[in-house]
């Protein structure tokens, strides 16, 4: 999944750079619209007309008729058939990094697929691919999601359709790149980040580590030879709510377990005195005392 997303990001960035370098000219749009209006009544002649234009150099000044679809929002649409795609998949029309007159191999088209192979509206919707229409046979606008299956093919080797990867466009895109090959227009920061992340799983992380001591062995616990002193212990609870302090004080037998909260425990050993001598003179025991200010609390 990460490789697929990286491919979409790289293709989208290259298309955006191409559009920024040479935006779509109004003349090219008008010619595409005129060509589409001529064949709208007879769509069966689209493929034959396109092949006739590719046969001669004079066809470079006109758009490939099979690549033109309906228009939305003033932007022409193109139609591309890739592996597993139908003729009805309308794609967004764009202009490659070269002008139509300057291209020596034929018209180059720009189109956008989503992950399901459906047409995507808008040029900046981005998993787009620059392709070349001056190829042989039905490889004119090959592309789409099925190209991700050939992502392991090296440059120069034929894909599953039998066409060399290096024949795609004046600036070919390697389909063998991985997520670590992604570079943005600003530089190679993402490339370096992905490289470090990929290495992080194979090498131990440097820096300080927290050494947690093992739990103590109960068998080796030192036991005191003196018995636990019998009697009572004083427990105090302080609650502060921002403007006042509440204090609870009480006593519990020494043999009882210390727990959080105002809990009156009972003697478990049977040897603790029933009445605490300190509680006899302490009027605050078992009575909540509150103070408005901290200095008012006696030490």
Swiss-Prot record:
Gene Ontology terms: cellular component: host cell cytoplasm
Location in or out of the cell: Host cytoplasm
Keywords linked to the UniProt accession: Host cytoplasm, Host-virus interaction, Inhibition of host innate immune response by virus, Inhibition of host interferon signaling pathway by virus, Inhibition of host IRF7 by virus, Inhibition of host MDA5 by virus, Inhibition of host RLR pathway by virus, Inhibition of host STAT1 by virus, Inhibition of host STAT2 by virus, Inhibition of host TYK2 by virus, Interferon antiviral system evasion, Metal-binding, Viral immunoevasion, Zinc
Signal peptide: none
Region (Disordered): 41-99, 134-162
Composition skew (Acidic residues), residue ranges: 146-160
Binding of Zn(2+) 1, residues: 232, 251, 276, 279
Composition skew (Low complexity), residue ranges: 134-145
UniProt main location, coarse: host cell
Family annotation (InterPro entries): Paramyx_V_Zn-bd, Paramyxo_P/V_N
Domain notes: The N-terminus interacts with host JAK1 and STAT1. The C-terminus interacts with host STAT2. The C-terminus also interacts with host PP1.
UniProt function note: Plays an essential role in the inhibition of host immune response. Prevents the establishment of cellular antiviral state by blocking interferon-alpha/beta (IFN-alpha/beta) production and signaling pathway. Interacts with host IFIH1/MDA5 and DHX58/LGP2 to inhibit the transduction pathway involved in the activation of IFN-beta promoter, thus protecting the virus against cell antiviral state. Blocks the type I interferon signaling pathway by interacting with host TYK2 and thereby inhibiting downstream STAT1 and STAT2 phosphorylation.
Subunit structure: Interacts with host IFIH1/MDA5 and DHX58/LGP2; these interactions are involved in the inhibition of the host type I interferon signaling pathway. Interacts with host TYK2; this interaction inhibits the type I interferon signaling pathway without affecting the type II pathway. Interacts with host IRF7; this interaction inhibits IRF7 translocation to the nucleus. Interacts with host CHUK. Interacts with host RELA/p65; this interaction inhibits the nuclear translocation of NF-KappaB.
Family, per entry: Belongs to the paramyxoviruses V protein family.
Protein name stated in the entry: Non-structural protein V
Protein encoded by which gene: P/V
């Amino acid at each position: 999944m990460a490789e697929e997303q990286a491919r979409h990001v790289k293709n989208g960035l290259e298309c955006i750079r191409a559009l920024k370098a040479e935006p779509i000219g109004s003349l090219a749009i008008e010619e595409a619209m005129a060509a589409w209006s001529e064949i709208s009544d007879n769509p069966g002649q689209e493929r034959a007309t396109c092949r006739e234009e590719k046969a001669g150099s004079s066809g470079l000044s006109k758009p490939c008729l099979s690549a033109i679809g309906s228009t939305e929002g003033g932007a022409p649409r193109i139609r591309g058939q890739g592996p597993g795609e139908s003729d009805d998949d309308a794609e967004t029309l764009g202009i490659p990094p070269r002008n139509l007159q300057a291209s020596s191999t034929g018209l180059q088209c720009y189109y956008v697929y989503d992950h399901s192979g459906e047409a995507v509206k808008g040029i900046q919707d981005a998993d787009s691919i620059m392709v070349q229409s001056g190829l042989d046979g039905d490889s004119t606008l090959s592309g789409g999601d099925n190209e991700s299956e050939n992502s392991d093919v090296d440059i120069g080797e034929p894909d599953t359709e039998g066409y060399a990867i290096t024949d795609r466009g004046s600036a070919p895109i390697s389909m063998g790149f991985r997520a670590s090959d992604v570079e943005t227009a600003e530089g190679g920061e993402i490339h370096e980040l992905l490289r470090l992340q990929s290495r992080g799983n194979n090498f131990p992380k440097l820096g300080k580590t927290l050494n947690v001591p093992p739990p103590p062995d109960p068998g080796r616990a030192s036991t005191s030879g003196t018995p636990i002193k019998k009697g009572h212990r004083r427990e105090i609870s302080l609650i502060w709510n921002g403007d006042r302090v509440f204090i609870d004080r009480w006593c519990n037998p020494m043999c009882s377990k210390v727990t959080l909260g105002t809990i009156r425990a009972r003697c478990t050993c049977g040897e603790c005195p029933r009445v605490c001598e300190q509680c006899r003179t302490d009027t605050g025991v078992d009575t909540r005392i509150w103070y408005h200010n901290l200095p008012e609390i006696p030490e």
